[in-house]
Amino acid sequence: MVMGGEASMELDQCFQKMKMEGISIKEWKDIPVELLMRILSLVDDRNVIVASGVCTGWRDAISFGLTRLRLSWCNNNMNSLVLSLVPKFVKLQTLNLRQDKPQLEDNAVEAIANHCHELQELDLSKSLKITDRSLYALAHGCPDLTKLNLSGCTSFSDTAIAYLTRFCRKLKVLNLCGCVKAVTDNALEAIGNNCNQMQSLNLGWCENISDDGVMSLAYGCPDLRTLDLCGCVLITDESVVALADWCVHLRSLGLYYCRNITDRAMYSLAQSGVKNKPGSWKSVKKGKYDEEGLRSLNISQCTALTPSAVQAVCDSFPALHTCSGRHSLVMSGCLNLTTVHCACILQAHRAHNAVPHPAH
């Protein structure tokens, strides 16, 4: 593997330090832990796993030094691999187990919960075989979870989601896209009651949720920044009004195919932008973002909307763009909204008109 300049410099510094301290390496097992971990940070996870079997010294060093592991490359026998690895890698904070085909079962997730108590980020997307047992285990074994991806997991219930939120109250990012059975108004009420640090929530294609569930979220998760409601066909303007009123830091909202959304929802968003600009839209970390407020809005297939209402949203949030290459206001399938334009296009048009043209 080719090393970058910074990584190569760090290794050189380690070797120089060893030279100054008179440390000699006669066998691989003699490599200092600090140097071993720096070397392993430069190779892929397959080689890290191989290295953990070289000798007991390496195994112990990796066991207590490895904090990130990705096994999404494993196309076969991931369940067995997880069962064999997690008892050794007890200091993991980030674990990616994304699958192209269902492999993971409840016993593997239970092993993770039993051994990896410091876990903060876990990707279990497309784990079609895991059930409520897995979520109950995570609730008790991994209370420090801040990021959890369960997208495409279809075999657990809303009761298990509610139970998980009672114990994993630090969750900030939760992906439940396609979890139709598990995502109900009761599940959203539990998230709103227990996870007030939530910042990003994907509920795409969870078609059973209604305004009651979304309003519970809005009231309970005021720090929400990103919310995907694409394909949530039952929600109406009431959901968007609640989000506009309570989630003043909202930056990205997906409403694709929410055909019950009307102009009232758009005007509530526009009004929230005007109302919150003086104080709360200002970014705390100046320089990272010019201002807060909506930067991404998907209203594709929301065919009840009119140009004036959508233009009002666009005018309230200058970070929404319709111009080529910067599309952050997505309106596919809304043929009546072709006249809606962002500030960039209007400014370019004015600049063009201001330039004197030679007489013909």
UniProtKB/Swiss-Prot annotation:
It is found in: Nucleus. Pathway: Protein modification; protein ubiquitination. One of its GO terms (biological process) is lateral root formation. One of its GO terms (cellular component) is nucleus. Induction: Cell-cycle regulated expression with higher levels during early S-phase and G2/M stages. Repressed by auxin through a ubiquitin-dependent pathway (at protein level). Only biologically active auxin promotes proteolysis of SKP2A. The keyword Zinc does not apply. GO terms for molecular function: ubiquitin-protein transferase activity. Keywords: Auxin signaling pathway, Lipoprotein, Myristate, Nucleus, Ubl conjugation, Ubl conjugation pathway. InterPro entries: F-box-like_dom_sf (IPR036047), F-box_dom (IPR001810), Leu-rich_rpt (IPR001611), Leu-rich_rpt_Cys-con_subtyp (IPR006553), LRR_dom_sf (IPR032675). Expressed in embryo, seedlings, hypocotyl, roots, leaves and flowers. Polyubiquitinated and subsequently targeted to proteasome. Auxin promotes this ubiquitination-mediated degradation. Pfam families: F-box-like, LRR_6. Residues 25-71 form the F-box domain. Its main location: nucleus. (indol-3-yl)acetate binds at S127, L128, N149, L150, S151, G152, N175, L176, C177, G178, N202. The F-box is necessary for the interaction with ASK proteins. Component of SCF(SKP2A) E3 ubiquitin ligase complexes, which mediate the ubiquitination and subsequent proteasomal degradation of target proteins (including cell cycle repressors). Acts as an auxin receptor; one active auxin is indole-3-acetate. Regulates the stability of the transcription factors E2FC and DPB, repressors of cell proliferation. Confers increase tolerance to osmotic stress by promoting cell division, especially in meristems. Promotes the formation of lateral root primordia. Part of a SCF (ASK-cullin-F-box) protein ligase complex. Interacts with CUL1 (RUB1-modified and non-modified isoforms), SKP1A, SKP1B and ASK18. Recruit DPB and phosphorylated E2FC. Interacts with auxin. Auxin controls the interaction with DPB. This is F-box protein SKP2A.
